[in-house]
Amino acid sequence: MDTLFRLVSLQAASEQQQQQQQSASYNSRSTTSSGSRSSSHQTNASYSYYHHSSNSGGGGGGGGGYYYGGQQPPPSQYYYLEPYQEECGNAPHHQLYMDEDFSSSSSSRHFHHGAPVQQQQPPASSTPTGTAPTPPLSTSSTAAGAGHGLFEAADLSFPPDLNLDFSSPASSSGGGTASSGAVGGGGGGRWASQLLLECARSVAARDSQRVQQLMWMLNELASPYGDVEQKLASYFLQGLFARLTASGQRTLRTLAAASDRNTSFDSTRRTALRFQELSPWSSFGHVAANGAILESFLEVAAAASSETQRFHILDLSNTFCTQWPTLLEALATRSADETPHLSITTVVSAAPSAPTAAVQRVMREIGQRMEKFARLMGVPFRFRAVHHSGDLAELDLDALDLREGGATTALAVNCVNSLRGVVPGRARRRDAFAASLRRLDPRVVTVVEEEADLVASDPDASSATEEGGDTEAAFLKVFGEGLRFFSAYMDSLEESFPKTSNERLALERGAGRAIVDLVSCPASESMERRETAASWARRMRSAGFSPVAFSEDVADDVRSLLRRYREGWSMREAGTDDSAAGAGVFLAWKEQPLVWASAWRP
């Protein structure tokens, strides 16, 4: 079973169970399973139950669409875990989750429509991934101690009020909202959103029995190697589990350490290039931002005297510099006279607890390659990487020495998916950071952010709490919007990448870490609190910036870029009546705006 929690390894137990099952009938297995559940309810200890689907238990009854609604699941094997608090509350974190290997433990199939559906298997990777040890399997119950307060022993049958439709695949084209997929409706195959939203409501209401039932169901259906719905269930369930056990930061440290062990320059390069090749998600912002920066620099060069021009880009983006080769080439070919000097200072931000050794190795290699490419293009070039740990608002911009060429140096600030790295708080930190960018007096500031409303209201408002409004209502609002956004992202990867792809798996794991951060961490600690274009535009205007419309040449470049990709991607300009009030352009997937690109000047 591709179980999300990875609390117990079922490999050895499965082999032993298979030998015992050869002489057992279908009914005897059902009776045994029911008896195990019944006997467990008579103990005083709290146990967490995890269901292991048997391929021989296939079914679900009848033809047509397969619904979970009031009927018992197929015959299956049940395993006892140690008392919940002992395993989940006090166990070392590497026992709660297998790092990022997510290797299948015993079953690789789920049953939809009463028939097995083969899941996507993890691709063979040239970079080995470690496997954390798992706690021992307990074959008998004990009555020692009370369990975790959130999970009391409960009947793990399917709740009778759930009516989930698996008859059609999920699609993000409908533009779902936070309230879509209400439990009880058909849902058009969006069973993950239905179950996850209901589970989030139960978590907010502290309904421990229903939480346990729903998490058991989700654990049965989730898989990081399945379809979009199974992946959403897998990653959001991991986030919910970390939230319930107050282990969000610990979980992120474990996932980050696993990613760090398996990160190299080659793997990073392959993933970035493959992502750009098959999806415009990142290259859309790169093309728009480069166009605005280049036009700004060329304006300076045209109006300047004969002295050598110096341009400096402050890159506040963790894009591994994939944006800059095309800009270097454009500077070399479009400069009328002497090629200007270009300096790039890139700030690589990371969470305080995240390992940075692998990223530092990658950035050293990137810097060497960038300098070599600039020499080939004939562009005088200087590259510097600054590694920053923690909140981007704590970065001392004045210490970066951005005017090494004196007052004649033209400065551009590039912010690609970086402003959300400023953690919301009571001191209006995001507004303050935008104001600090204004004090640099740049020629242009490019802002590219993913379009999602993942803050409760205005986390920087004076009336907000230090946690950014972490109430039950705020949690549900952010959870629902996160489902919408990451569903569209996963759907775009599903339709753009091959079924088996190491690069796609790496991107999905990155999204999984973002989901865990969003769901399990309070707003005051989360690095994934995206905002809408309207919010960012308001902040930039308040800081003293005015929007710069992209020229028709830049817009044509973006449209030409999108024609290289599969159908479903489109560009939408922000009109004057738009939420962004005429600032920038949007990248849309199946009519859903997902990425916003804009340019600003003082």
Curated annotation (Swiss-Prot):
Residues 365-401 are annotated as: Leucine repeat II (LRII). Its main location: nucleus. GO terms for cellular component: nucleus. Residues 12-69, 101-145, 165-185 are annotated as: Disordered. Residues 56-68, 173-185 have a biased composition (Gly residues). A motif (VHIID) lies at residues 311-315. Residues 520-601 are annotated as: SAW. Coiled coil: none annotated. Residues 183-601 form the GRAS domain. Residues 12-55, 103-145 have a biased composition (Low complexity). It comes from the Eukaryota. Residues 272-349 are annotated as: VHIID. Residues 411-517 are annotated as: PFYRE. Residues 190-253 are annotated as: Leucine repeat I (LRI). Keywords: Developmental protein, Nucleus, Transcription, Transcription regulation. It is found in: Nucleus. Belongs to the GRAS family. Interacts with SCR1. Transcription factor required for the asymmetric cell division involved in radial pattern formation in roots. Essential for both cell division and cell specification. This is Protein SHORT-ROOT 1.
